[in-house]
Amino acid sequence: MTPEIDEARGAALTAITQAATVADLERVVAEHLGKRGALAGLKKGLGGIADPEARRAAGAAMHAARTAVEEAVEQRRDELA
C-alpha cells in the first residue's frame, strides 16, 4: 500500500504547485485531503491490512504523506496571498 500512498502524495504535491489561485488551491485540498479524496480513500484501507507490521508501516507513510501535503498547502497559500 505504501507505493499507492506515495503516488497519491506526489499527485497532491504536483497539483498544489500548479494551483494558480487560492480558489484553485482549495479545490486541490478538497480533491486530495477531503472525505472523498485520494488519501482518505487509502486511509480507509489501512484497517484491511492483516500484517501488523505492514499496517504500522502504511500508517506511518500515510501520516507522513498527509503532513507533507498539509505543509505544502500552507506554503502555497502564503505564496498566493
Locate the predicted segments by residue:
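N-terminal alpha-helical targeting/anchoring segments
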Residues: 1-81
